[in-house]
Structures are given as C-alpha cells and as structure tokens.
C-alpha cells in the first residue's frame, strides 16, 4: 500500500500556476510601451471609471434633490383607539408593553395614539404621545391618557 498523502507533500499540478507577466521591465519582455500602444491618454495613465468619453456625466444629468433630512425628526408608531378598544374590550390600564404584547406595534419604539374610530370602554392609556382627538375620546369614555 502507498503512503498516505501529507499536507506538506501537496504541490500544484504542473503548469497550473503560471507566473504573472511583468510588463515594462526591459526590451526583451514586453518592455518599452508594455502593451499600451504609442502615445495618447491611455498610454500615459488610467482613464477614470466615471469618465463617459465627453458625454454629460450621469451625476450631472440627474436632477438635484430639494430639501434636507431633518436630524431632529421623531418617528412614532401609530395605533388608533379603535384598535385599542378591539384588543382591550374589558378596559383597564393599558401600557406601552401591553400594546406591544397585543401585537399592535413593535417593541423599543415610540408609540402615538391616534383618534380614528370610537371607544366605549374605560381605558387608562399610557403612551409617548396622543393626538388631540384621541385624548378627547379616551377621556369622554371615562379613561385617562398619560404621556410616558
């Protein structure tokens, strides 16, 4: 039986690793112009990948965008009081954690309660923000709207 192959005995197959041709290293081996032809921009340097051959460049053809991104913008996840009334028909205290557990919003984000729909049960809602109509409807039903 032959000996097992060992890692230090491994060699690439003959002719599989061809040496890279080093151009511009003497007349005998692609020296002088080194395969670039004679004269001109491409013989002297690389042309920028963004250069479009004198055609108006893409970044200049596209329209400018107006406005800016407000760094102070606060994004709220919204939930309507109709959804709260549907998920909590027994009434009682409703915190942000309860709203997340009910699947109305994602966790770790701010919650705003909006006044779309009607509410008949008494809910003591705690959220990060309330619309005016939501606050009125919750308080009209006998509940309270507390900002967390």
Swiss-Prot record:
Keywords carried by this UniProt record: Ribonucleoprotein, Ribosomal protein, RNA-binding, rRNA-binding
Assigned GO CC terms: cytosolic large ribosomal subunit
Basic and acidic residues composition bias: residue spans: 1-11
Superkingdom, taxonomy of origin: Bacteria
Segments traversing the membrane: none
GO molecular function, one term: structural constituent of ribosome
Biological process terms in GO annotation: translation
Region (Disordered): 1-52
Listed NCBIfam families: rplO_bact
Function: Binds to the 23S rRNA.
PANTHER family named among the record's database cross-references: 50S RIBOSOMAL PROTEIN L15, LARGE RIBOSOMAL SUBUNIT PROTEIN UL15M
Subunit record text: Part of the 50S ribosomal subunit.
HAMAP family assigned to the protein according to its UniProt record, in alphabetical order: Ribosomal_uL15 (MF_01341)
Similarity section: Belongs to the universal ribosomal protein uL15 family.
The protein, known as: Large ribosomal subunit protein uL15
Native organism taxonomy: Bacteria, Bacillati, Actinomycetota, Actinomycetes, Mycobacteriales
């Amino acid at each position: 039986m032959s000996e097992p192959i060992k890692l230090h005995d491994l060699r690439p197959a003959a002719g599989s690793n061809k040496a890279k041709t080093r151009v511009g290293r003497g007349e005998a081996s692609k020296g002088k112009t080194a395969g670039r032809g004679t004269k001109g921009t491409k013989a002297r340097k690389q042309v920028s990948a963004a250069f479009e051959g004198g055609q108006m460049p893409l970044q200049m053809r596209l329209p400018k965008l107006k406005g800016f991104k407000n760094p102070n913008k606060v994004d709220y996840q919204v939930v309507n009081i109709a959804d709260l009334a549907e998920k909590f028909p027994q009434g009682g205290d409703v915190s942000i954690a309860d709203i997340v557990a009910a699947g109305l919003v994602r966790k770790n984000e701010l919650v705003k309660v909006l006044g779309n729909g009607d509410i008949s049960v008494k809910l003591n809602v705690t959220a990060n923000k309330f619309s005016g109509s939501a606050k009125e409807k919750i308080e009209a039903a006998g509940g309270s709207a507390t900002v967390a």
